[in-house]
């Protein structure tokens, strides 16, 4: 599973996910004001957090719904900085400027720019109203995820050249927390990320979110920032 998909799906970051195809086309081409209320409540909820620690489970299914793989891990998020630790020896660090992705299997670190102008839903973007500029959105109604009543909001990227064509957010109706996220790519794959044990008052230092070369001795660095 490619690690950049984790950043796309999270957003990482905020249960079994039900795949509900949108039937309401009333707001195609314009934004649904009811969906905006739900998204604004989510944004306000996240902005109330000083620092976030949350567990996640990411699974990938093909166009036929067959499971292709799954990963679990923990995300640490503070402002525009984050650290995603994935079971199996993969780590992603973002210092707000650059993103460092370490893959234990290849002992390689890939360095890319953290571009705030992209339509990727990265963890730090969840603290903003990114949806007002980058997406068309509509409210598909309510559903049940376990014992929780969630509101389902569908996002469609304005830029049609993106590798994905739809994102569905499942937001707790009572707490306004992001329970699950599903990303649909143009290749027919579906990426579902479920979150749990969200701590909005987590304590960790900026150093714990920063990439430290000394932690990965002998790792080859591949710099793709240019």
Task: Provide a role label for each language-model segment.
Residues 18-67, 80-81, 215, 220-226:
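N-terminal leader/targeting segments and the immediate start of mature chains
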Residues 58-60, 86-87, 182-185:
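Beta-turn initiation residues at beta-strand->coil junctions
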Residues 22, 135-140, 144-225:
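Gly/Pro-enriched, hydrophobic low-complexity segments
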Residues 74-120, 191-192:
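An acidic-aromatic
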